[in-house]
Amino acid sequence: KQDEKFFGHYSLFGDDSLDKNLKKFGFVKEDITDVFLTHLHFDHCGGAIEWNDDQSGYRPTFKNAQFWTNENHWKWATEPNPREKASFLKENILPMQESGQLNFLPTPTTGNYGFAPDLKMDVIFVDGHTEKQMLPVLQYQEKTIVFAADLIPTAGHIPQVYVMGYDT
């Protein structure tokens, strides 16, 4: 959907693809029923939308899926501030709504939102990397897994405990 210059800066390396990776596990794109969008920056939601067959417009990549975000973040993405405007590309966002596949999670003023209790999944809403980013919290095999996305993109972004010591 973007031009050659864009992909000169932001493109995948190698011959891996979504279709190949889904096939490895016995799935195709039509099997996907839900897409949880941590936030709507192009590098997190761009793959959710693709060209239609004659490249005259766009369509959801996952035609049988519901797309999940929250209304506060949607408003932030569709009416962006100057700093984030380049990260919210309308061609990656608006087709979700136009297709009728977009859903908004309620945004609680305190605490988490129980998104899928049967999957043991909650959602934490944070302001930091972007307004009302959603972090999925999963309970799995007696462990808690939080996908922090760009809020904490690498282990290097977590401050280390440091106790100063020296000899006198």
Residue ranges and their predicted role:
Residues 1, 40, 72-73, 128-130, ...:
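Active-site metal-binding loops of divalent metal-dependent hydrolases
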